[in-house]
């Protein structure tokens, strides 16, 4: 049984993974995407962060400098390097179908696979069904 299963490898999931790793806990991060970058993999080309790189850090390691507001490609690269730097145990692509709790532990179902853990963190974000405006 794992200490924790984190569902989602975006900003929140990576930050949780950092602290779980720091505490030496046994965990896995399940991510539905085929690679790093979370929702940034699906944005329109002109989308940027609304803050500069110095204000967009994940715990433990600052985002590399970028003049102005970083574009999606910069964020995706940062996420990928962050995952590698902290050797986060991310499995992709894994789509979680269901999470149950039996009173003692959580059961996470993904396709034909079932994992168990003492805790689950839902870090799926809000971009599972993004609204992209039409102009």
Predicted segments with their positions:
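Short amphipathic alpha-helical segments
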Residues: 17-19, 41-42, 129-135
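Conserved Rossmann-like nucleotide-cofactor binding loop
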Residues: 12, 35, 127
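Glycine-rich active-site loop/strand segments that organize a redox cofactor
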Residues: 38-77
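FAD-binding core/adjacent interface of flavoenzyme oxidoreductases
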Residues: 1-2, 85-135
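N-terminal Rossmann-like FAD-binding beta1-loop-alpha1 element of flavoenzymes
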Residues: 2-29
């Amino acid at each position: 049984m794992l200490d924790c299963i984190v569902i989602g490898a975006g900003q929140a999931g990576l930050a949780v993974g950092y602290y779980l790793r720091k505490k030496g806990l046994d965990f896995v991060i399940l991510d539905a995407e085929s690679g790093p970058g979370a929702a940034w993999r699906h944005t329109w080309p002109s989308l940027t962060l609304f803050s500069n790189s110095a204000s967009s850090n994940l715990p433990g390691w600052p985002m590399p400098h970028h003049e102005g507001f970083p574009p999606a490609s910069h964020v995706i690269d940062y996420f990928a390097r962050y995952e590698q730097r902290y050797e986060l145990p991310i499995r992709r692509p894994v789509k979680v179908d269901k999470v149950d709790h039996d009173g003692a532990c959580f059961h996470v179902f993904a396709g034909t696979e079932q994992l168990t853990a003492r805790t689950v963190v839902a870090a799926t974000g809000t971009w599972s069904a993004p609204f992209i405006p039409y102009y």
